[in-house]
Amino acid sequence: MKVTTLTVDCGGTGIKASVLDKGGKVLIDFPYLKTPYPLSPSKLIGIIQDFVKADLRIKRVTVGLPGMIRNGKVVVIPHYININGPRSAVDPNLKKAWYGFDMQSILQKRLKLPTLVLNDAEVHAAAVIEGRGLETVLTFGTGLGSAIFSDGNLAPHLEISHATIRYGKSIDTWIGEQARRRMGNQLWSRRVKSLIQELYPMIIWDKLYI
């Protein structure tokens, strides 16, 4: 039986999905979907169900979510608890719905397919690491994503992006997409370089992927 995987990247501004074969070859890219707000867990599950219904070849599902995801369960999640998305007001009801939500178990039950839910940066990282030494992956988008692997084994997730770096700002705010657009690529790239220099003494990676 062919192993065909639906991969879903759930971001703060957009949701991207692809179907991959066993070797990681892309069989189909679904059209980019702007993240709809407000976004409840049930609404996101409905979106993923629609992807599965659109391609009968899908045999398993991998979902990447922003924030702290532990054993498939949401510990902390940004963006989706906000009424209108990133940096808008927090909706207490959305926060209550998302925090502690067992996305992996519930999604697997709904889809009736093997399902894995991880932090989005960890999913990206799994596609690029070599599995040797201490490897760190940093992703830049709405905010900063990160993943650390030791000899191919995923380390417990750290929300590095929540740390304060300059002027009382979190790394997310200091280095995110909004800052890049405001500053321009050249100045923003200097910030990225500065951030990497500050992170290295804390992690001391053998290889860094950006």
Where are each of the predicted segments found?
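Active-site glycine-centered loops adjacent to acidic/histidine catalytic or metal-binding residues
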Residues: 120, 141, 210
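Glycine-rich phosphate-binding loop and adjoining helix at the ATP-binding site
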Residues: 36, 41-49, 60, 69-127
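Glycine-rich phosphate-binding loop plus the immediately following alpha-helix
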Residues: 97-121, 154-194
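Phosphate/pyrophosphate-binding loops at sites that engage ATP/ADP/AMP, CoA/4′-phosphopantetheine
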Residues: 46-62, 71, 111-115, 185, ...
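Short glycine-aspartate micro-motif
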Residues: 5-9, 60-62, 135-139, 209
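N-terminal phosphate-binding loop and adjacent alpha-helix
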Residues: 25-57, 86-99, 174-191
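Short glycine-rich, Thr/Ser-proximal phosphate-binding strand/loop in the N-terminal lobe
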Residues: 2-46, 150-181
